[in-house]
Amino acid sequence: MTSRPRTAARLAAAVLALATGASCAPSPRTCLTLVPEPPADKDTVQVVFLGVGGLIVRWQGAAVMAAPLYSNPTIGEIALSEIHPDRQRIDALLRQDIAGVGAIFSGHAHYDHLMDVPYVALHKAEHADLVGNNAMVKLLEPIRRRLEPRQELVSLESPNPPVYEVPGAQIRIRSVASLHSPQMGPHLVGWLGRLLINFPRVTLWRGEDEDPAKELPVRAGNWTAGTTQAFVIELLDAGGDVAFRIYYQDSPTVAPYGYPDWPNNPNRYELAILCLGGATEYKTFPGDIVRYLAPAYVMGIHWENFFDPRPLPTPGATGVKQRIDYAPGVKEGKFLGRVRDAQPAGGRAIVPCPDQVATFRKDASGWRLVDDKGWSKRR
């Protein structure tokens, strides 16, 4: 049995590593948040970044959602107390209409992806199936009876089929076996930290329990990741052909993990949604995955310091300016530079603010941004 002093020492080391990484982080970014989402045209693809790993994809009057996080427990709360969905903060910050969302998907089952999902699914997206891996299904077992019969828990991990057709929507989701990057390591702590300690790569909360949970977890470490997945999201036309293809990941990866159809990509990708947080130990990311997918557009997500809860806004406030810290180790400029070096000619990239919307419309030359504010210039 681990002694309390030893546990405290390990926790202190982890917090020190994160703090050291944070101390080297760029200055906070000023974002315009709580921007009302414009109505979605049926013939456009609308992608709304919700913050952390969350987003909404709208197509032909239907929508799917990547698991959002608004509760954002602090490091102190994670270490010293139970953690629970902050319903007040979710209600205040999740302004988008998600009543028509057909599925909420998550690539792994850590708390920063799944903790808020039960409340969102049961009270806001009441027709959405919950799609993920086997660990997600086990951890959310305690709410199964409340979800059924309108909603289901769906695993796309083996031995289950890896493809999910969203009911009543021209949207298909395909899982790709991936892995979770180390949250901490020598490149996060920097050269000074490496002089003081031989810091190993640390991947927190790996694996999964054998049996379904009897209660929803209330400790961060009990939200175990399971087998991490990436997703290919295919938006289909009336004939069932792919009109717009999206790659989504909620953890950085290295080849061949998370690379669809490895080693030869046969498909065109209009948009790749890539995770910035946790990428410090992967020197070839994101260049390798961008070269492999050759997407016309790249969106970087999970860049914020999610240990810092967003402030509660004044009721009804819109267009609120907010200073948001980067997650430890995240360097937006370096990420965008590597993306640009790897993208095909004409490619564009962005690291969006929470509530920012990207709308794509097709013309004779292909899919184009309706409003390109904040996007990089064409490569």
PLM features: residue spans?
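Bacterial N-terminal signal peptides that target proteins for export
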Residues: 2-12
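Binuclear metal-ion centers of metallo-dependent hydrolases, dominated by the metallo-beta-lactamase
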Residues: 129, 137, 141-172, 291-379
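C-terminal motif of bacterial Sec signal peptides marking the signal peptidase cleavage site
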Residues: 22-23
